[in-house]
UniProtKB/Swiss-Prot annotation:
Component of the ubiquinol-cytochrome c oxidoreductase, a multisubunit transmembrane complex that is part of the mitochondrial electron transport chain which drives oxidative phosphorylation. The keyword Electron transport applies. It holds the Pfam family UcrQ. PANTHER family: CYTOCHROME B-C1 COMPLEX SUBUNIT 8, UBIQUINOL-CYTOCHROME C REDUCTASE COMPLEX UBIQUINONE-BINDING PROTEIN QP-C. It comes from Rattus norvegicus. This is Cytochrome b-c1 complex subunit 8.
């Protein structure tokens, strides 16, 4: 009647190759090469990435402190009120 799912149509002049899911490995060299590579890349880029984040954090905390201080009332203005 029809073709099975995955082979629904046939396209001329197109060659496709596939690997069986049983022959694939989900995480090849994940622990032996992947994690050390992440550590190496992090070590190489930390001096380029960290300073802007530190600067942003300092500006952000300073801004929050200034905002909180600007919302408080100044007691010196109300010393002579009765």
């Amino acid at each position: 009647m029809g073709r099975e799912f995955g082979n629904l149509t046939r396209i001329r002049h197109v060659i496709s190759y596939s690997l069986s899911p049983f022959e694939q490995r989900a995480f090849p060299h994940y622990f032996s090469k992947g994690i050390p590579n992440v550590l190496r890349r992090t070590r190489e880029r930390i001096l380029r990435v960290a300073p802007p984040f530190v600067l942003f954090y300092l500006i952000y905390t300073w801004g929050n402190q200034e905002f909180a201080q600007s919302k408080r009332k100044n007691p010196a203005k109300y010393e002579n009120d009765k």
